[in-house]
A protein has these predicted regions:
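Zn-dependent metallo-beta-lactamase
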Residues: 2-54, 61-63
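Metallo-beta-lactamase
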Residues: 24, 30, 120-182, 190, ...
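Pre-active-site segment of Zn-dependent metallo-hydrolases
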Residues: 36-91, 101-108, 206, 210-217
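Catalytic core of the metallo-beta-lactamase
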Residues: 47, 154-223
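Active-site neighborhood of phospho(di)ester-bond hydrolases with catalytic His/Asp-centered motifs
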Residues: 56-60, 86-98, 116-118, 196-199, ...
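Active-site HxH/HxHxD metal-binding segment of metal-dependent hydrolases
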Residues: 77-145
Length: 315
């Protein structure tokens, strides 16, 4: 009987640790900005909290971000080992250079791994980036000779895919980004989720339903407390005219989209919910305005998080 009680107590302890405060994910931002500063462009290493098997969400900046992360204590090994051993693959949201240039520049020093993206993004890698006129073909498709370091994995919308050599899976969703298809990645580890959005404009301006459909998928996960955070861009302050957003969000439009999400997930469901604000565009005065405007418009009481390059975040 005592043995049964001990087993029961151990189970309850494990369950309570899981239910109250145990972290599911760690995020190491390698780059957090949306332009100009080539040393700090969109890239976020993501892994289960107890693992060093990371996937990189976009790859605008790699080496500089890894060095910053080492300086801030996120990693205890040399930068080249983080690149070669810890990053197991890349989820690329779309084909704009500020989201993948770090991957290209670091490719000679990298190890064999997968690049996951929608078909049109992978086609751009094949025909524009990993070619012998612009760089070298480090992939196993496209121009010859092929150096076969990277393998392309085409993602299908709303289809779960294993992220190889990690404990995570991903579902990709199309997003509207002006004249280009971007993507959102819903990453799962055990029974927890985190959502990362590449560049995206509001449905109303983009004449799209992509965010609406995405929020419909997220609402049940929010209700069940399984979605730990949404990482979403706010590129410009509210002073930016709608006609020159070019497929991006402002504080006003982010909060409009969050209102739409809360209508689906239930009143009060987003209070203290983690929103990681990504892709803020310099200059610093604009970034300061974005933060002030988001604070003023935060009627839903979201937990707004502004990632810092190299500083790990736990969810």
């Amino acid at each position: 009987m005592r043995a049964i009680n001990n087993i029961l107590l151990a189970f309850l302890f494990t369950w309570s640790a899981s239910a109250f405060g145990q972290n599911a994910f760690k995020v190491v931002p390698l780059g957090v900005k949306g332009g100009i500063d080539e040393s700090n462009l969109s890239a976020y290493m993501l892994a289960p909290a107890n693992s060093n098997n990371f996937v990189c969400l976009d790859a605008g900046t790699l080496h500089t971000g890894i060095e910053k992360a080492i300086e801030k204590g996120a990693f205890k090994i040399p930068a080249e080992q983080v690149l070669r051993k810890y990053i197991k693959g890349y989820l690329i949201s779309h084909s704009h250079l500020d989201h993948l240039s770090g991957l290209i520049i670091n490719s000679p020093e990298d190890t064999t791994k997968n690049i996951y993206a929608f078909a049109d993004c992978i086609e751009t890698f094949k025909t524009r980036y990993f070619t012998w006129k612009s760089w070298a073909n480090f992939a196993d498709e496209g121009e010859t000779p092929q150096l076969k370091k990277y393998h392309y994995k085409v993602l299908s919308p709303n289809e779960e895919t294993q992220i190889e050599n990690t404990e995570m899976t991903v579902k990709a969703f199309p997003l509207s980004h002006s004249n280009l298809t971007s993507s959102a990645f819903l990453v799962k580890s055990q029974d927890s989720y985190i959502l990362y959005l590449g560049d995206v404009g509001p449905d109303e301006i983009e004449k799209s339903h992509n965010l609406e459909l995405l929020w419909q998928t997220m609402a049940p996960l929010i209700q069940e407390k399984k979605l730990k955070a949404i990482m979403i861009e706010v590129s410009f302050p509210d002073e930016q005219p709608d006609k020159t957003l070019f497929g991006h969000l402002t504080p006003h439009w982010l909060m409009k989209e969050m209102d739409d999400l809360e209508k689906l997930s239930g009143g009060g469901s987003l209070k203290d919910f983690n929103i990681v604000v990504t892709h803020v565009k310099p200059p610093q005065a604009s970034i300061n305005s974005i933060k002030k405007q988001l604070a003023a418009e935060n009627k839903l009481q979201l937990n707004l998080i502004y990632p810092q390059q190299g500083k790990a975040i736990l969810f």
